[in-house]
């Protein structure tokens, strides 16, 4: 079609099709009923078909109008989505970050509002994982993991260490005078087998069997400890809120260092210039984590 179709004519048709009334369409578009009618007639003339039947009590879409309407709606939706990507002259950017669940709830999410305030044109899509993630296969821009930084396919940036200590609800803590008193309680654990043995050694205790359930997340494990009156060994920096409000207690000052939290980015991406949003997030995260 050689003739350019005026955008106002398409807007007038779409609004009129929703209301089946030129007057109501005009109120939405802030133009007169006559202007809407003229825009629709212009579109009909360009297309060479009638889009409405003009009836005494309103409008009715013709077969051609019914066929055209969903295509117009889709076109407006595409334009709207494209325009939403801009914020105050900047194109919106989206990055996907896979975050180990304990870190997401205990540290990252409470601070993301500050990032969004500073960089409102960047959307962070957070997905959680249990420390097993394939960045390339899952289309992830970056991941935050727990460990020692020995991942081969990624560039690894340490955020901070995550010392583990005993956490339990206050009613249990009251009954723990010495570490040996924990023998009377169920000890919860994650999939890392060395956790409790390392803590027993740090506490100068002869190990005893740990038979509590195994969790894939320290967050879930500590929730279970609060509900069931059990004892957990967890990265206490991720539970500062619970410690401050008294729902969890550190009965002993004995800590073990089992690893830390790391930002990881595929080497294949690090070898080329990172996109602007990912580079901004990386810089913000490193600065924020190193300040604690």
Swiss-Prot record:
Domain HTH lysR-type: residue ranges: 5-62
Keyword terms of this UniProt record: Activator, DNA-binding, Transcription, Transcription regulation
InterPro entries: LysR_subst-bd, Tscrpt_reg_HTH_LysR, WH-like_DNA-bd_sf, WH_DNA-bd_sf
Gene Ontology biological-process annotations: DNA-templated transcription
DNA-binding annotation, residue ranges on this chain: 22-41
Pfam families xref list: HTH_1, LysR_substrate
Gene3D superfamilies, alphabetized: Periplasmic binding protein-like II (3.40.190.10), Winged helix-like DNA-binding domain superfamily/Winged helix DNA-binding domain (1.10.10.10)
UniProt superkingdom: Bacteria
An annotated Gene Ontology molecular function: sequence-specific DNA binding
UniProt similarity note: Belongs to the LysR transcriptional regulatory family.
PANTHER family named in the record: HTH-TYPE TRANSCRIPTIONAL ACTIVATOR AMPR (PTHR30537:SF70), HTH-TYPE TRANSCRIPTIONAL REGULATOR (PTHR30537)
Function statement: This protein is a positive regulator of gene expression of carbapenem-hydrolyzing beta-lactamase (smeA). Seems to also be a repressor of its own transcription.
Name of the protein this chain belongs to: Carbapenem-hydrolyzing beta-lactamase transcriptional activator
